[in-house]
């Protein structure tokens, strides 16, 4: 808010416009864009933002950044749930590809599910969205929650899993690699590496 006020005092405007959607949506120009600040300024820059995706005005200064924290808290919980679910499936001995096909049209399905589950099944942890970047956002959410004097128990679990990834040298891998935490805890290997024929 301090930077916002400095810009305003200097006769300028400042908008916070974090994005979500990862590399594929950035390339396609379909990012979710969360913009906070003066509404009039948002209206002026909306056509520029629209070149990159779908801008939504979230309210006053810093509201875009807080909205992004909400997005990443929820996204982190979904990612950890996917990792846990697929480790559970592997331990139970059911086919992961069949599980994916059977569940992707249900409540569990969605863009993140469609993006990450095939990576888990193939054990492809090439970074598209690095755990390190997401962990930074989770730490920011925890910091803000502390300022608000609130508990975030599910986000605590997400941070615990991401901290384990950091401590075990997997922090720069794709978010799909979160399954490695559950492989360690459940004593199971999830997915298969594809080999060239």
Predicted feature locations:
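Hydrophobic alpha-helical segments
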Residues: 10, 186-197
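Helical "substrate-binding/catalytic lid" subdomain
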Residues: 44, 63-185
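Rossmann-fold dinucleotide-binding core
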Residues: 1-73
């Amino acid at each position: 808010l301090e930077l916002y006020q400095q810009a305003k005092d200097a006769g300028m405007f400042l908008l916070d416009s974090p994005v979500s959607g990862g590399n594929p949506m950035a390339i396609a120009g379909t990012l979710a864009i969360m913009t906070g600040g003066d509404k009039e300024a948002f209206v002026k820059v909306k056509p520029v933002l629209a070149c990159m995706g779908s801008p939504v005005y979230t309210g006053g200064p810093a509201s875009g950044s807080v909205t992004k924290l909400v997005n990443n808290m929820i996204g982190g919980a979904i990612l950890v749930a996917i990792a846990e679910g697929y480790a559970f499936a592997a331990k139970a001995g059911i086919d992961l590809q069949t599980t994916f096909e059977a569940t992707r049209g249900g409540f569990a399905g969605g863009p993140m599910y469609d993006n990450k589950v095939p990576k888990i099944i193939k054990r492809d942890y090439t970074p598209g969205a690095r755990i390190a970047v997401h962990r930074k956002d989770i730490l920011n959410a925890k910091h803000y929650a502390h300022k608000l004097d609130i508990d975030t128990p599910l986000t605590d679990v997400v941070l615990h899993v991401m901290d384990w990834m950091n401590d075990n040298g997997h922090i720069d891998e794709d978010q799909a690699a979160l399954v490695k935490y559950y492989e360690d805890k459940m004593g199971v290997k999830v997915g298969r590496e594809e080999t060239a024929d």
